[in-house]
Amino acid sequence: MAKDREAQERRRQHREEARAREQAARQRTRRLRLIRRVGAYAVAAVLAGGLGYWAYAKISAPLPGQAMPTQGNDHIPAMWSPHPPYNTDPPTSGWHVDNIAPWGVHGTPIPKELQVHNLEDAGVAVQYNCPQGCPDLVKRLEAIVKAHDKYVLLAPYPGMDKRIALTAWGRIDKFDEFDEARIDRFIKAYKGIDHHKR
């Protein structure tokens, strides 16, 4: 009988040990699942935070050029029709004729009343002032403008106070030294944005 009791006691101990091992294994599995879940949430939170920061930085980054008050988009019958003066030179908004200048490179100045309509129609104007001529500058500006198939003009603009002017609807940037990155950033920021009243 004592042997039976000992055998029963050993079986009971084995069962308890097996239960304890199973319980420990279940706890390890639960812990691993919890760690994986927490890890996945942490990775998702870091990714969401990074994406949110990137979007915020992109949205809050200052736009190129200087913002100017717009002067409306009234049409006038002809380029020589009287109208109030523009608030920028070259103009960035205001009175203009019904048609637009062809997109691309121009060898002669584009009348203000014509180029303003191009700006309203989603365009960007790149203009230069070189009283003594500047073929190298013009060639570099042409290369930039030709890289954009539509919505960009290049033309001389005699008499302005800087060598280079970039204009879009309600925006202007003027400077003397060629800066390809600055020009390209301005064009990419504003070309293709239509400004017609809806």
PLM-predicted stretches and their roles:
Residues 40-53:
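Hydrophobic membrane-insertion alpha-helices, especially the h-region
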Residues 143-198:
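Helix-rich interaction surfaces within compact, conserved domain-sized segments
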